[in-house]
Amino acid sequence: MLFRSVKNAEGEFSQQQIRPPKSGEGQPKVLRKSQGRFVFQRPGKFIWETTKPFEQKVIADGQRLLLWDKDLNQLTIRPAGKSLSASPAAILFGQIAIDERFELIPGGEKGGMYWLELKPKADKGAGDMPYSRGGVGMANGLPVGLELHDNFGTITLINLSKIRINSNLGAEVFKFNPPAGVDVLNVQ
């Protein structure tokens, strides 16, 4: 299992969704930018907290996937199933090891990282993946970059920084208590 020795980690992320340039355009078009922090713990727990441009928090507590949107004052709760397994955070930190779901193909060095191409394995739920291809950028034995190409041509670029591994995370880290008056949607 890739990153087998990493039981938990926390750090910061920046994320961009871009569209490749159309004919006549010189640069890719940035569709969306965000940044925030992440925490994960195996098996199956993570927090992906967006702080900019707006506050949102995605929490996988091992059983459920919770999406907290501060601006909407809304918490959506759903079982941790297919929706979780296809998220970028779950690809890196999920219950199923990245090398069990993807064939890892050496891709060379780019941007100070050693890249591995991610090719979904046909027998590991590739049909459930919204990504046609991707890559993970490694530095010092840790994933620090992720590039995912979806079936519509959009590219998601994620950079991880200030990573701390195997720290002493308390059990309360993955518990979320919504503020009073929040709308709660339970989706089955």
Cite the ranges covered by each PLM segment.
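A mature extracytoplasmic/lumenal domain signature
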Residues: Q15-Q17, R42-G44, T50-F54, G62-R64, ...
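Structural motif
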Residues: G44-K45, R64, N140-G145
